[in-house]
């Protein structure tokens, strides 16, 4: 029953994209400046990939509550041979609930620091605003004293699902802090929809960036 439910959700979401989405040419310019852009960074090329569709659908369902001068933008990365990594705006419009702003032609590790920065910079360029907020979606191991690879977020196993404790590339929290320093943005807030990432140690590591 669970597999059937997941299949139905996947089919429904695919139909939603085909029937009710607008896809921009990657050369299209940015949107007009808004009040706030919330960026949801979904690092789903791991054991959480099966949940990306349903969680994204929840964002779409709540899109009608987004104020007209705010933007909710999702970077969606999941295990798929067909669906490319993309930056997608949730519009709140019933006729066109999602708007694909940019689709990457070549796959990449979302937890590589340079790629993390590039995605966020591109999203901020496409959806300029007076202020920005960030939601991190994916696996997290928080901040421990074991080794850097465990003070981390968003493991990426490439385009395959495997045991996230053994394989894949993490974005270490010290590296994430350096990414934020490079971006030079003071987030309105940083929300972590992942394990072990809402502790005081994580907040202290990122204290100067929100």
Question: Where are the language model's segments positioned?
Answer:
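Short, surface-exposed polybasic-aromatic patches that bind anionic ligands, especially phosphate groups
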Residues: 14
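C-terminal motif of bacterial Sec signal peptides marking the signal peptidase cleavage site
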Residues: 17-19
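N-terminal extension/subdomain marker
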Residues: 21-130
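Extracytoplasmic/secreted cell-surface and envelope-processing proteins
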Residues: 47-52, 82-84, 142-147, 197-202
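Surface-exposed loop and adjacent secondary-structure segments within mature catalytic domains
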Residues: 75-104, 131, 135-170
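Catalytic cores of nucleophile-dependent amide-cleaving enzymes
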Residues: 135-144, 151-210
């Amino acid at each position: 029953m669970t597999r059937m439910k997941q299949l139905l959700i996947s089919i429904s979401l695919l139909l939603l994209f085909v029937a009710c989405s607008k896809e921009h040419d990657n050369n299209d310019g940015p949107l007009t400046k808004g009040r706030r852009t919330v960026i949801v960074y979904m690092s789903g090329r791991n054991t959480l990939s099966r949940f990306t569709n349903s969680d994204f659908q929840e964002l779409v369902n709540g899109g009608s509550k987004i104020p007209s001068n705010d933007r909710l933008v999702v970077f969606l990365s999941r295990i798929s041979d067909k669906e490319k990594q993309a930056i997608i705006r949730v519009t709140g419009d019933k006729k066109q609930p999602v708007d694909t702003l940019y689709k990457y032609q070549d796959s990449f590790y979302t937890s590589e620091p340079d790629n993390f920065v590039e995605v966020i910079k591109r999203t901020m360029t496409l959806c300029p605003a007076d202020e920005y907020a960030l939601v991190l979606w994916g696996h997290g191991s928080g901040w421990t004293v074991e080794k850097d690879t465990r003070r981390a977020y968003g493991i990426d196993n490439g385009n395959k699902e495997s045991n996230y404790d053994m394989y894949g590339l993490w974005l270490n929290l010290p590296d994430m802090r350096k990414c934020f320093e490079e971006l030079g943005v003071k987030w309105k807030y940083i929300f972590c929809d992942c394990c072990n990432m809402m502790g005081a140690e994580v907040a202290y590591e990122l204290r100067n960036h929100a």
